[in-house]
């Protein structure tokens, strides 16, 4: 009998000791559980037949936290885990790990990679990895072991060593607990695993190859795989979606620095969410700015202005720095009837439960921003410039940040204005398909086609675009469902070009999973409903930019606006705290009808 439970499971150990004796092994059988062994509900787990007795099934939105595990698995150790993968196309999935990225705590991870193979990751002031050459079998139990000494790490699959790497220094200790099925970080499940886990052990020393080989006994238990729900079409299935290295480079694009990378002279530690708008011959850009950590009260909304089409930028101006525990962050612009409006995401204190949207209008004489107060509450964060609909109202795409328990999903949403009154909006939260689970972070964008509105949104940690459709000017929506278009785990930005082509800026390739590189733009044929070609805007290492060029670059939260035959695309290098601009000739995106 199956027993579904909501959980960030905190499972107590059978035996935990901090001495280096062989008898002092931390063991989590994961056969069953009792209510008093839980804490911090998140996601859903279910009892299933395990490799050894019972096991726990995770739904792709759950994570298991091992109680009292923070002191374990440092320097010399061995971690072993039975796992049964259900979906090998879900991007990078954590089987086990000891990391909290937002706190700078990184030690090690065991993952299933986008290619469906096992890999170990070890922190050495940067990740070093041990890839496994063997494919995994969905529905079957596998046993993985990571054996680590002070100067070497070895990865095993089903009792056999599959790779190793030298370590320049021992794996350092952090306060992060060990988690299974994902990483629990800043209130979110990251790199979630879909499948089942069983029998996790942590030895306080590096086990020998002979011990590990002797400890493996194959499991004949197999699981029936969940029947996949047919994806909704967003990509033209008659066309092959290329791998990143096979994408055509968009022609004629130029690149400019909007905000220089860290360390800059402004003390910035974090920036995100470029917004763009042309207004009276000038190009305005906004972004979130923080000398501290993301989503904290020290967040500010900054603005810069270019008078030469984005080639150079004036000094940054503070639109709103907030007061007390108020943080004001990134948002969107709208130039309307001679006025420049801004709608910015904001929050009090700890972000969740207080998210709202504030409106501002530019005073043309003083070049200062006049605050107009809160115009949307209940968790609305703006993600796309408002667009006028044929019924006379404006529609603004966004994210609904849940104010309930932390296991609540954060679905895509839109706001609809009261005609031309841009201070009065109604939020319409988009329902989500039941099979998506709760691990959703629905940063969304819309394409307006008369009364028909398409909403494309980020899934969460799964690298796949969600799609929802309204046939009544955004008043009601089909449930947001998984589409047939891979997309990285970042905010997308979409629209319709003057050529009649739909476009989508994000990272859309067949092989990059949740990586935010390269930066791409997908387009349709003129008047067509499906995307059918993807261009590369730029790659991580790129000689054509005056800005960041590095082996690992994360192109985050793009934004786009068309003007005089050019598409202006803003984006953030989140890990480098830099904002940049690509200017693309619209004619270079044209494909034959």
Q: Can you say where each PLM-predicted feature lies in the sequence?
A:
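Bacterial N-terminal signal peptides
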Residues: 7-17
């Amino acid at each position: 009998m199956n027993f579904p439970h909501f959980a960030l499971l905190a499972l107590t150990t059978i035996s935990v000791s901090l001495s280096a004796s062989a008898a002092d092994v931390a063991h989590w059988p994961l056969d069953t559980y009792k209510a008093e062994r839980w804490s911090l509900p998140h996601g859903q787990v279910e009892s299933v037949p395990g490799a050894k007795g019972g096991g726990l099934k995770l739904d792709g939105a759950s994570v298991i936290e091992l109680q009292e595990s923070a002191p374990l698995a440092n320097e010399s150790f061995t971690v072993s885990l039975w796992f049964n993968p259900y979906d090998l196309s879900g991007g990078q999935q954590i089987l086990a790990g000891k990391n909290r990225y937002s706190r700078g705590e990184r030690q090690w991870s065991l993952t299933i990679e986008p290619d469906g193979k096992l890999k170990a990751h070890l922190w050495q002031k940067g990740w070093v990895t041990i890839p496994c050459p063997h494919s995994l079998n969905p529905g079957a139990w596998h046993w993985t072991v990571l054996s680590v000494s002070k100067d070497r790490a070895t990865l095993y699959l089903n009792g056999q060593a599959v790779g190793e790497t030298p370590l320049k220094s021992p794996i350092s200790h952090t306060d992060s607990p060990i988690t299974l099925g994902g990483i629990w970080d800043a209130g979110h499940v990251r790199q979630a695993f879909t499948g089942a886990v069983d029998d996790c052990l942590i030895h306080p020393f590096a086990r020998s190859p002979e011990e590990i080989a002797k400890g493996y006994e194959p499991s004949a238990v197999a699981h029936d795989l969940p029947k996949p729900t047919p994806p909704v079409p967003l990509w033209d299935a008659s066309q092959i979606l290329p791998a990143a290295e096979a994408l055509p480079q968009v022609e004629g694009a130029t690149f400019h620095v909007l905000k220089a990378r860290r360390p800059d002279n402004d003390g910035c530690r974090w920036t995100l969410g470029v917004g763009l708008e042309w207004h009276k011959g000038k190009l305005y850009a906004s972004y979130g700015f923080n000398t501290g950590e993301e989503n904290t009260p020290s967040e500010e909304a900054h603005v810069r202005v270019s008078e030469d089409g984005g080639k150079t930028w004036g000094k940054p101006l503070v639109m709103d720095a907030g007061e007390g525990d108020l943080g004001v962050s990134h948002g969107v612009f709208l130039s309307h009837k001679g006025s420049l409006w801004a709608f910015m995401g904001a929050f009090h204190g700890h972000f969740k439960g207080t998210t709202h949207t504030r409106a501002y209008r530019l005073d043309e004489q003083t070049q200062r921003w006049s605050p107009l107060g809160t115009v949307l509450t209940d968790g609305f964060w703006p993600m796309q410039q408002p667009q006028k609909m044929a019924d006379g109202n404006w529609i603004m795409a966004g994210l609904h940040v849940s104010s309930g328990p932390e296991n609540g999903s954060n679905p895509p949403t839109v706001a609809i204005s009261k005609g031309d009154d841009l201070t009065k909006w109604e939020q319409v939260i988009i329902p989500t398909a039941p099979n998506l689970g709760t691990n959703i972070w629905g940063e969304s964008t819309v394409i307006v086609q008369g009364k028909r509105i398409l909403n494309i949104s980020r899934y969460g940690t799964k690298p796949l675009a969600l799609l929802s459709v309204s046939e009544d000017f955004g008043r009601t929506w089909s449930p947001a469902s998984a589409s047939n278009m891979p997309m990285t785990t970042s905010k997308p930005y979409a629209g319709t070009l003057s050529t009649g082509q739909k476009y989508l800026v994000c990272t859309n390739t067949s092989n990059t999973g949740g990586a935010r590189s390269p930066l791409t733009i997908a387009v349709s044929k003129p008047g067509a409903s499906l995307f059918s070609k993807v261009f590369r805007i730029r790659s991580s290492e790129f000689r054509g930019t005056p800005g960041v060029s590095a082996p690992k670059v994360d192109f985050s939260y793009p934004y786009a606006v068309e003007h005089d035959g050019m598409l202006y695309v803003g984006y953030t290098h989140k890990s480098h705290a830099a904002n940049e601009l690509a200017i693309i000739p619209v004619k270079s995106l044209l494909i034959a009808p």
